[in-house]
């Protein structure tokens, strides 16, 4: 299952055309969708967002 397709209050699509609009997903596959704030380093094996600010607690 693709963790990027988890639209809670928006649309997340990690298919051929990757889009992420108003998405409340908790995780995303690599850097496919901008679930983490802009400028926040994505984790190599995926990204788990823990907040809306870019700091050490953004991704784990």
UniProtKB/Swiss-Prot annotation:
Entry text on domains: Class I metallothioneins contain 2 metal-binding domains: four divalent ions are chelated within cluster A of the alpha domain and are coordinated via cysteinyl thiolate bridges to 11 cysteine ligands. Cluster B, the corresponding region within the beta domain, can ligate three divalent ions to 9 cysteines.
Question: Which of this chain's residues are annotated to bind a divalent metal cation 4?
Answer: 32-33, 43, 47
Q: Where is this region: Beta?
A: 1-28
Q: Give the family, as the similarity comment puts it.
A: Belongs to the metallothionein superfamily. Type 1 family.
Give residues annotated as binding a divalent metal cation 7.
Answer: 49, 54, 58-59
Which residues are recorded as binding a divalent metal cation 3?
A: 14, 18, 23, 28
Q: From what superkingdom does this record's organism come? A: Eukaryota
| Molecular functions (GO terms) | metal ion binding
Organism of derivation: Trematomus bernacchii
Gene name as annotated: mta
Sites binding a divalent metal cation 5 sit at 33, 35-36, 49
Segment Alpha: which positions?
29-60
Keywords assigned: Metal-binding, Metal-thiolate cluster, Zinc
- Binding, a divalent metal cation 2: 6, 12, 14, 25
UniProt name for this protein: Metallothionein A
Q: Where does a divalent metal cation 1 bind?
A: 4, 6, 20, 23
Which amino acid positions bind a divalent metal cation 6, per UniProt?
Answer: 36, 40, 43, 59
> What does this chain do?
Metallothioneins have a high content of cysteine residues that bind various heavy metals.
